[in-house]
């Protein structure tokens, strides 16, 4: 049986494979919610602050996440894992690797839309809910405000 080659590395978030994987994964979520104009504007204005990392299996991109350090907190955004690679440790390995790429991190923070069911995914990864509120960034498909949830995880040395 041939050995599978795994690799995680920093990428350009505009790279074609990153954009395609993100679009494919987030298309599923667009059945549940969509971004408001405010969210699109914010994402575009802060894009340069984020570093993008990708998880490759045999040179095929199967997971991505964006990260930025704010003080001693590492904030994660746009975590996406190809459907056929979910529940196989890709997100956990990606997050663990990204934490090692920044100095003096005490906690990792991630936001998600409650109605997607992703809160349970992050809880399974060791994150705890710290706040939830009606979002100005996301609207549910029925036109009501989505509930944004912030989850955090302590980082141990």
Protein language model features and the residues they cover:
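Conserved acetyl-CoA-binding loop-helix of GNAT-fold acetyltransferases
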Residues: 81, 87-100, 124
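Conserved GNAT acetyl-CoA-binding A-motif
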Residues: 102-113
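Conserved active-site alpha-helix within GNAT-family acetyltransferase domains
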Residues: 92, 115-132, 140-141
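Terminal substrate-recognition subdomain of acyl/acetyltransferases
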Residues: 110-111, 139-157
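Acetyl-CoA-dependent GNAT
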Residues: 10-78, 82, 95-97
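Conserved N-terminal entry element of GNAT/NAT acetyltransferase domains
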Residues: 1-16, 153-157
